[in-house]
């Protein structure tokens, strides 16, 4: 997908696992994948888990932040950055390596059911903003 979206450099996938129902899982995954702050962090290769939890929080879906686990994945591996709502002692270098790939997945486990949902989007780049800010119809 990055090649098909002008100004996009990465496919960004968000998986939400163990939600109580499909609506909750979809709402959370869509909130994270569409968050401008999260998309900008993905572009900047920044494992900013606070932006992910923030997007989840304003989604309106019910979840317990103290039960949330967040991992980042790509062809370069997997890294757990949040466990039970608390940042892990993860390697920034490894996180940057994972986030440098052209396809990145955030795996979020809310430990509150058996339902999973996945949403797809892209990063938010300077070029994307320029293309769309300068476009005139």
What residue ranges belong to the model's regions?
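N-terminal glycine-/lysine-enriched basic segments
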Residues: 1-27, 33
